[in-house]
């Protein structure tokens, strides 16, 4: 879902201010998490004052900040004790033509009651079978029931087992998605750097080292934040 959100961001810059605010929230949360982290582990440098003139590095910093903001959004939804229909809207569905689309683009998702999701396929009934399968295979841990062109999903109440499942999903799926998004940014920036500094090997080497350090630092910050949120959730398990 993080990568899906990255694609949506590329389609419009209207969320820039929101993401900047989310990045600030992320930074604050990471500071708290670092205080509790193993002191034997040192964080890679996140600020490169000697590369302020390097356009590739500066653009990469902005891209990483956007993804970090998206991670905060994803974790907020994931660990919320309330039903969030966006978790269902973002489920990717593989259609008969082989294309993957989020559920929100092929059906109307609404909250019928506090613990029931209604997914209406009236305008796209041929997609209901694929959507049902996608929901069943997702990490939502629910079983949709079909009535005509509508799927109904009973959301299970919060329990010890469900909290533990949410914590496990965060450490696995969400962290992997986040790392994949960060790695894509690194790969794109590294390729751009190689082309831009093809005749300046020293600058290319310095840029590559900076990009790699930024990648590792972002991965560590993301891991710290996820671990902090997991611990907070599991504290509520009796």
From Swiss-Prot:
What molecular function does GO assign, one term? Answer: ribosomal large subunit binding
Cellular component annotations (GO), alphabetically ordered: mitochondrion
Please verify whether the record's keywords include Mitochondrion: yes
Task: Read off the SUPFAM superfamilies from this record.
Answer: Ribosome recycling factor, RRF
Q: What is its main location?
A: mitochondrion
User: Which range is the signal sequence, renumbered to this chain?
Assistant: none
Q: Which InterPro entries match?
A: Ribosome_recyc_fac (IPR002661), Ribosome_recyc_fac_dom (IPR023584), RRF_sf (IPR036191)
One GO BP annotation of this record: translation
* Keyword Phosphoprotein appears in the UniProt entry: no
Q: Which UniProt keywords apply?
A: Mitochondrion, Protein biosynthesis, Transit peptide
Coiled-coil annotation: which residues? none
Question: What is the official name of this protein in its record?
Answer: Ribosome-recycling factor, mitochondrial
